[in-house]
């Protein structure tokens, strides 16, 4: 408790923590050694000043050290968003993940229940019949047999129980909104990572660069979505071969029509699950288009497609052939066959 006070004192002066200081501070937080008052003061001091790249690297390092790991193929990918964009859209990354798995790229999907929308990845998967909350062996069996496994944040980041009530009571974004997508329990080095603000594109790419990321796109839609959007341009900061570059993409570059935000709105988990099943069944819609765009980006990241146009064609074939629907059926069967849910 007393060991934590110097970190608060430093932040109170407007100074930032070094990488080592941030790691030490978050190690104490994840060990449950910090009082609620200390935690609240610490998080808000950091938020008001603005979290630095070194502070995030230190926090991620501490969080990764305590996570319950999953063994996945080295070429596995995660399609994930920070959430918190406030738009309540359809579960784009979940549908995109199923499409990518059907294209032969292993997917180690990390997610949670809804934060700002009515239906998070875990919510819609449960509505589809997938058993979430599996332990590492259960997730590994799903990845082996279905090409995709879902890792529930609470199951694999048990240390987060020490911050759960403070996050709810603060009721505003903190550094923890950024940490989850940066701490995939399967240790993926390939990611399509959507963020709630364009300001975080470069910083998060720098964090992943420092922590061994190989090929990552950090993305934000011009409409505010934490995904590649089909309503207009999307901003991308890519990490590849150790180098970072930024560019803009449009749905037209992928051969897709433009949509409106209203077209992309989601509902409750059951509504979104029904729409997802329809999309997997080949129904043409704005949901299908935005999922194909994000799947195409993941296929480019995974070196399965040379560009977005080719990625969309490969993804559409996986949907229209029934392969993506078959992936979901396998995931449902394997997740329920395993009795190791936490």
Curated annotation (Swiss-Prot):
Query: Where do the annotations place Mg(2+) 1 binding?
Result: 93, 227
For this UniProt entry, which segments traverse the membrane? none
Where Mg(2+) 2 is bound, by residue? Answer: 226-227
Looking at the record's lineage, which domain of life comes first? Bacteria
The UniProt catalytic activity note for this protein reads: N-(5-phospho-beta-D-ribosyl)anthranilate + diphosphate = 5-phospho-alpha-D-ribose 1-diphosphate + anthranilate
Chain positions recorded as anthranilate 2 binding sites: 167
The signal peptide annotation in the UniProt record is: none
Look up the EC number in the record and give it. 2.4.2.18
Annotated pathway: Amino-acid biosynthesis; L-tryptophan biosynthesis; L-tryptophan from chorismate: step 2/5
Molecular functions (GO terms): anthranilate phosphoribosyltransferase activity; magnesium ion binding
Keyword Glycosyltransferase recorded: yes
Quick one: which residues bind anthranilate 1?
Answer: 81, 112
In terms of InterPro entries, this protein maps to:
Anthranilate_Pribosyl_Tfrase, Glycosyl_Trfase_fam3, Glycosyl_Trfase_fam3_N_dom, Glycosyl_Trfase_fam3_N_dom_sf, Nuc_phospho_transferase
**Cofactor(s) it depends on:** Mg(2+)
Cofactor mode of binding and number, as noted: Binds 2 magnesium ions per monomer.
Q: Which GO terms describe its cellular component?
A: cytosol
Q: Where 5-phospho-alpha-D-ribose 1-diphosphate is bound, by residue?
A: 81, 84-85, 89, 91-94, 109-117, 121
Q: A GO BP term, please?
A: L-tryptophan biosynthetic process
Q: Does the keyword Glycosyltransferase apply?
A: yes
Query: What keywords tag this UniProt record?
Result: Amino-acid biosynthesis, Aromatic amino acid biosynthesis, Glycosyltransferase, Magnesium, Metal-binding, Transferase, Tryptophan biosynthesis
Q: What does this protein do?
A: Catalyzes the transfer of the phosphoribosyl group of 5-phosphorylribose-1-pyrophosphate (PRPP) to anthranilate to yield N-(5'-phosphoribosyl)-anthranilate (PRA).
Regarding protein family, the annotation reads: Belongs to the anthranilate phosphoribosyltransferase family.
UniProt cross-references to PANTHER family, sorted A to Z: ANTHRANILATE PHOSPHORIBOSYLTRANSFERASE
Q: How does it assemble?
A: Homodimer.
Query: What is this protein identified as?
Result: Anthranilate phosphoribosyltransferase
User: Which source organism?
Assistant: Beijerinckia indica subsp. indica (strain ATCC 9039 / DSM 1715 / NCIMB 8712)
Source taxonomy = Bacteria, Pseudomonadati, Pseudomonadota, Alphaproteobacteria, Hyphomicrobiales
Q: Which gene is transcribed and translated to give this protein?
A: trpD
């Amino acid at each position: 408790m007393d060991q934590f006070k110097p970190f608060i004192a430093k932040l109170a002066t407007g100074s930032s923590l070094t990488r080592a200081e941030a790691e030490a501070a978050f190690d104490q937080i994840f060990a449950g050694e910090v009082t609620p008052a200390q935690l609240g003061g610490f998080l808000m001091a950091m938020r008001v000043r603005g979290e630095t790249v070194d502070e995030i690297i230190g926090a991620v390092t501490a969080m990764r050290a305590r996570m319950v790991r999953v063994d996945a193929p080295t070429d596995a990918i995660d399609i994930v968003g920070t959430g918190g964009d406030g738009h309540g859209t359809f579960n784009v990354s979940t549908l995109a993940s199923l499409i990518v798995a059907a294209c032969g790229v292993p997917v180690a999907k990390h997610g949670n229940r809804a934060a700002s929308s009515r239906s998070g990845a875990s919510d819609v998967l449960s509505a589809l019949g997938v058993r979430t909350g599996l332990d590492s062996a259960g997730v590994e069996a799903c990845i082996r047999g279905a090409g995709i496994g879902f890792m529930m944040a609470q199951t694999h980041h048990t240390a987060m129980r020490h911050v759960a009530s403070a996050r709810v009571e603060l009721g505003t974004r903190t550094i923890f909104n950024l940490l989850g997508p940066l701490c995939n329990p399967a240790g993926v080095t390939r990611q399509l990572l959507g963020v709630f603000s364009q300001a975080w594109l470069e910083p998060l790419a720098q964090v992943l660069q420092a922590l061994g990321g190989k090929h990552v796109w950090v993305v934000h839609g011009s409409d505010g979505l934490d995904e590649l959007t089909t309503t207009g341009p999307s901003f991308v900061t890519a990490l590849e071969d150790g180098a970072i570059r930024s560019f803009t993409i449009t749905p037209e570059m992928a051969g897709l029509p433009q949509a409106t935000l209203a077209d992309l709105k989601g509902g409750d988990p059951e509504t979104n699950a029904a729409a997802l099943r329809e999309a997997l069944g080949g129904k043409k819609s704005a949901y299908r288009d935005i999922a194909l765009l994000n799947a195409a980006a993941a296929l480019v990241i995974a070196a399965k497609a040379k560009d977005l146009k080719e990625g969309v064609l490969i993804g559409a074939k996986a949907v229209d052939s029934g392969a993506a629907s078959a992936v979901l059926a396998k995931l449902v069967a394997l997740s329920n066959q395993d009795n190791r849910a936490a």
